[in-house]
């Protein structure tokens, strides 16, 4: 009998853990200010070294799970890949920019100062340009998605990130009037995508050669689960120890940032999901296609926001709000996908 799987305890209550990290981080910033002051000294090229290490602990295990050899199967059933790539790279970054600009600069203009609106827009753009990696496997499972095909979708997107993320971010931030140092942006992509991706590929090949694929999937990869959890929690606490003053002065801004992020998530899900219905794809391909577009690679977005704008920036705060809202919104979309399975043909497309 197949072991029942689903969203883990930590992932299910991620919003609660993030809320606790907000409280702990703010408390540290207010009552133990020496801690963030000391951490701020450990920087290189605007990159916080402690945070970089923690983010590697999050991203490296994700890259271990992706079998990039699966990309060779991309031509067998191309429609789902086309939907995923077009949604993630041609539609999503631009709708995120448009929705965020509308809310931060127009609808919430009287509530958000112009300087902060610019930073929040930058954070939203970073989220919109980074499609999800690790959590997609959870959402795919919860919607009874085709696991092998989801793997191909994720692998293709991770490879596209290498070449498309930096130009798209630079272009959209330039349109929004946000100046960014290209060298820092490229360094961020190298640090938080190229290095962990390369390390993941090398590790995967070496371990599978020595121990086999079953050992790798059932034993080796699972050893890193706690590191990922710990890395995320500690990163959030550090971030909020720097962000405490901003949050205490503007508590409503958490909600204001969340509104366009939630709307964008729902919109992109229905764009990809509706496209899959139009092309008559099977539900086990359509649902993961919608989930990949809807969710974000928030670890990468947080890392790049810190590198480009700093730990205390509004851009970093916006990316962290993305972490806060992601799980409850995605669970809602999982429910919608499962309740609309009858929209799709029974036979594989």
Spans of features found by a protein language model:
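Alpha-helical transmembrane segments of multi-pass small-molecule/ion transporters
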Residues: 1-64, 69-294, 298-349
